[in-house]
């Protein structure tokens, strides 16, 4: 069975995340590379409202997720190799540093993102 890595922050879980994870699970054993709090602060400019350990617990409760590991914002091929992963699965807003032959992209779910939810909730 292929080992699939899906990187995400999960600052606000929504149905687009679940759909991506379901598609990833069709390809093999799914490990979520979950962005650490400090990286979210560095890249997005805010501390996540749900801290890493709680986001990890949420991710592990999703039936498509087999494991969760911490990660920085960008994933590179060395990260895949260090964790014995075959493929990186990502939405088509891909910005990582993994070669195309080890990447599977899926279209994002239209009309939803954590940023949109955050904007609706806090503005």
Q: What annotation goes with each model-predicted range?
A:
Residues 1-123:
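Nucleotidyltransferase catalytic core that binds NTPs
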């Amino acid at each position: 069975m292929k080992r699939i890595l899906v990187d995400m922050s999960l600052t606000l879980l929504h149905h687009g995340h679940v759909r991506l994870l379901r598609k990833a699970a069709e390809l093999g054993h799914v490990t979520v590379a979950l962005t650490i709090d400090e990286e979210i602060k560095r890249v997005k400019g805010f501390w996540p409202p749900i801290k890493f350990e709680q986001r990890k617990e949420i991710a592990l409760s999703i039936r498509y997720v087999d494991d969760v590991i911490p990660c920085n914002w960008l994933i590179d091929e060395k990260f895949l190799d260090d964790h014995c992963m075959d493929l990186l699965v990502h939405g088509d807003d891909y910005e990582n540093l993994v070669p195309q032959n080890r990447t599977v992209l899926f279209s994002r779910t239209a009309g939803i993102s954590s940023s949109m939810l955050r904007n609706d909730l806090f503005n």
